[in-house]
Curated annotation (Swiss-Prot):
Any single GO BP term: DNA replication
Subunit note: Component of a cohesin-like complex composed of ScpA, ScpB and the Smc homodimer, in which ScpA and ScpB bind to the head domain of Smc. The presence of the three proteins is required for the association of the complex with DNA.
Organism encoding this protein: Streptococcus pyogenes serotype M6 (strain ATCC BAA-946 / MGAS10394)
Any single GO CC term annotated in Swiss-Prot or TrEMBL for this entry: cytoplasm
Keywords: Cell cycle, Cell division, Chromosome partition, Cytoplasm
Functional summary from the UniProt entry: Participates in chromosomal partition during cell division. May act via the formation of a condensin-like complex containing Smc and ScpB that pull DNA away from mid-cell into both cell halves.
Compartment annotation: Cytoplasm
Protein name in UniProt: Segregation and condensation protein A
Similarity comment: Belongs to the ScpA family.
Pfam family, one: SMC_ScpA
Length: 234
């Protein structure tokens, strides 16, 4: 089974999405946390052998530079460091304004299109809304953070990554059986039991498929809260 995700319009679009989750002014977000989430997303795409565009990798290298300088001991204030971070935040803010204008123009275009007799062709995106206003991409971003933590655990435990083949159908059946007993489970709890990254990926894909089929329902009470799977919709 292949996973198909709607791409962001570029690295700034991804960064804006991550920043907007904090519900604060762009210049007040914890920039290191945002950078870590961005890097987790890129690394997860690579682990899952999904294509990563060059501009995303270029941004990743710039973010790693900002993060490394942020984490170094503050002996002397570096003006260049402040400039890099300030420049990044200004670009995100500028992109946010540009996107808002673009969306407003698109809305006006849609309104005008209603006056024509020819019906407007519907566009179907892979990034469909699931339950609780969560999209496929929202779940993937949350999963990438969990995936990064799991990679660290496996690395620290010197776990051997075996080339096991996990069938999505088997994982779907396993999740449904578990929900029959527990009715509510968290994805992170399931991932903790996994022994390989392949198993983690397969469980995520199985969960995503069950959610899209409305066999199970997803819930995340806060932007950075646990992802909960439940048998019945609340």
């Amino acid at each position: 089974m292949d996973i198909k995700l709607k791409d962001f319009e570029g690295p700034l679009d991804l960064l804006l999405h991550l920043v907007s989750q904090y519900k604060v002014d762009i210049y007040e977000v914890p920039i290191v946390e945002v950078i870590e989430q961005y890097l987790n997303y890129i690394e997860t795409l690579q682990v899952m052998k999904l294509e990563v565009a060059g501009d995303y990798m270029l941004m990743a290298s710039q973010l790693m530079l900002i993060k490394s300088r942020r984490l170094l001991p503050k002996v002397v204030e570096h003006i260049e460091e402040e400039d890099l971070e300030q420049d990044l935040l200004e670009k995100i803010e500028e992109y946010s304004r540009f996107k808002a204008v673009s969306q407003a123009l698109a809305k006006q275009h849609d309104q005008r299109a209603k006056w024509y007799s020819k019906p407007k062709q519907e566009l179907i995106f892979e990034d469909a809304i699931l339950q609780e206003d969560k999209t496929v991409m929202d779940l993937f971003l949350a999963f990438s953070n969990i995936m990064a933590a799991k990679r660290a655990v496996l690395k620290n435990n010197h776990t051997v990554i075996e080339r096991d083949d996990y069938k999505i159908e088997d994982m779907m059946a396993s999740i449904k059986q578990r929900l029959e007993k527990e009715s509510v489970i968290s994805l992170s709890a399931i991932f903790e039991e996994c022994q390989t990254l392949n198993e983690v990926i397969s469980i995520f894909l199985a969960s995503l498929e069950l959610i899209k089929l409305h066999v199970v329902f997803v819930e995340q009470l806060s932007n950075f809260g646990a992802i909960i799977l439940r048998k019945e919709k609340k």
